[in-house]
Structure formats: C-alpha cells, structure tokens
C-alpha cells in the first residue's frame, strides 16, 4: 500500500503517488471503464487525483465527474486537486492563450470545477502558472473566500519560483500546501535554483509533474546515455523497469516530492508505486544525474 504523507504544516494528507488525469481524453475510456480504473488505483493506495480546468481542452474534469456520478461513494476515498489560472484558445472567447488570476476568475473557475467533478469541495486548488499580472492581494482574497465558503480546503501553486511563492504566501493567513513543479532526470534546474530548498525549509512537499520527461526519456536520442545508465541501475536494484528507477530517483530527494503518474494503464501505475521499495544509494543517484546532464559535479 502506498505511503500517506502530510504535505505541509496544517496541510492535507495525500498518497505519496498522485494519479494525474491530464491525458484522460486520450485514454478513450467510457465512464464505466473509468470507474473501474479509479477503483483499481484506489486499491493500490493512490488516492490523490490531479486535475486542471484546462486539461483535455476543458473536458477532463467533466469526464471524471461523469464517472463519479456513477459511483459517488468513491469520492470519500480520494483527495481531489485541481488548478486554474490559464485561459486557452480551446474556448472561443480567448483569442490568445493567457494567464488570468483575478479574484472573480479564480472563484468562478473553482466553482465550475466543483460542477464538472461532481463534488462539493476541492481538497486542494492550485494557481497553475505564475502570472506577470498577478495581484497577490486579489489571489489571497479569492482563496480566503473559497476557504470560508467550504468549497476549497487547501491552496497551493504550480510552477512558481521561490520569490513568487514567497510573495503569495506573504498575503495569506494560512500556509500554502505545495508547489507543483517539473522534476525529472531530464529536467533538473529546480535541483539547484532554490525551489526545492525553499520547500524543504518550509516543510512543504512538492508535487512532481512530467517525471518521465513527457516521453523524452524514451524517444530522444540525446538521452540514450541516461537510458543506458538507468538500465544498469535497474539491474543493480532489481527494479522492474527504468521507469521505476526514475521514480525512485525522484523519491530520493529530501524535499519528499509526490510524483504524479500520467498513465491510463494500471500495470504502469503498479510498477511506479513499487518504486517506494527501492533503496537507491547516493552514488547511484549521482550516476543518473550525470548521465542525464552529460557532466560530473564540479
């Protein structure tokens, strides 16, 4: 069973692995099939699910909600995360993709997510990306309104720099619960830019998206040395796959990230969560780092 972890001081308790529904519309599941899939990953202990208003051209939340309408009892077995703050041209009124983090939009978006997801509350709402026009006071007003109304229990951000995180936190009477960021052997800037250090300092656990590099790990020739090293480490650890080793590499970080799994295949989810049992050494971790970036530590 997947470990459970409190992700921040006074924050929610989530499963250590998170089920990501970004690509739900690509899985071509009926509502009944989706119910079965949800039941299967809940049985594995993956109880936290990750959504965003824009996923699937604004369709993924509603598709998930249709499944919950068929099995409403499943809602009490899961924690639902969603995001807002990006507007895309998938909606006719948007002539250009842009960010929107004003008070009314955040509230309206969260309320629409509740309708779409067939639930009465979100366990966590995130601002999806930093907005150059973000007024931190307005965001704080929206968060406080949603909290007081009982519609959202906890709040966080995604893809924020430490300075952006600190700015928003300075306006809030409660602790931000997470910063959902890209962490992968093929994307390592956050390891040294202070993002994960800030979260470790605050005892806040990041959520990690694109752990497998959006497929680059498997199909980019540049990362062949990384694939080779992952295969060697997989043999050393008796791991089932190089994917499993990547998840173990992320779990080794002291900020204690929660990896988001983006697959609609239950076997891949099962393999991913088994990475918790792998004990990666410090030298194995640095071998993987070097294979990905192409050079040794200074």
Predicted features and spans:
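N-terminal binding-site loop/beta-alpha segment at the start of enzyme catalytic domains
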Residues: 1-78, 297
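Beta/alpha (TIM)-barrel catalytic core signal, keyed to glycine-rich beta->alpha loops juxtaposed to Asp/Glu
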Residues: 4, 130-298
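Acidic (Asp/Glu)-rich catalytic clusters
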Residues: 8-11, 67-79, 114-118, 147, ...
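Short, acidic/polar
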Residues: 28-41, 101-116, 165
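Alpha-helix N-cap and loop-to-helix initiation/capping positions
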Residues: 29-36, 59, 63, 97-105, ...
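Structural motif corresponding to the early beta-alpha repeats
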Residues: 75-101
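CE4/NodB-like, metal-dependent polysaccharide N-deacetylase domain
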Residues: 105-126, 146-149
């Amino acid at each position: 069973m997947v470990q459970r972890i409190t992700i921040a001081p006074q924050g929610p308790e989530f499963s250590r692995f998170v089920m990501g529904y970004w690509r739900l519309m690509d899985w071509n599941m009926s509502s009944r099939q989706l119910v079965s899939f949800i039941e299967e990953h809940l049985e594995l202990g993956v109880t936290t699910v990750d959504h965003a208003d824009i996923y699937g051209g604004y369709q993924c939340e509603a598709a998930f909600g249709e499944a919950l309408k068929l099995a409403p009892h499943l809602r009490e077995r899961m924690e639902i995360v969603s995001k807002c703050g990006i507007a895309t041209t998938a909606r006719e009124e948007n002539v250009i993709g842009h960010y929107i983090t004003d008070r009314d939009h955040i509230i309206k978006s969260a309320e629409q997510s509740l309708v779409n997801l067939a639930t009465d509350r979100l366990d966590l709402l995130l601002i999806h990306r930093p907005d150059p026009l973000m007024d931190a006071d307005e965001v704080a007003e929206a968060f406080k309104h949603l909290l007081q109304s009982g519609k959202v229990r906890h709040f966080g951000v995604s893809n924020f720099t430490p300075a952006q995180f600190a700015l928003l936190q300075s306006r809030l009477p409660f602790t931000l619960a997470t910063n959902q960021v890209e962490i992968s052997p093929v994307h390592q800037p956050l390891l040294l830019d202070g993002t994960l250090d800030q979260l470790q300092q605050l005892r806040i656990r990041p959520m990690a998206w694109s752990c497998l590099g959006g497929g680059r790990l498997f199909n980019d020739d540049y990362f062949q040395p990384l694939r080779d090293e992952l295969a060697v480490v997989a043999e050393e650890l008796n791991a089932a796959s190089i994917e499993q080793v990547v998840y173990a590499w992320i779990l080794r970080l002291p900020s204690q990230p929660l990896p988001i799994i983006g697959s609609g295949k239950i076997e891949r989810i099962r393999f991913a969560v088994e990475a918790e049992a792998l004990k990666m050494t410090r030298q194995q971790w640095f071998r993987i780092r070097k294979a990905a970036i192409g050079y040794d530590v200074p």
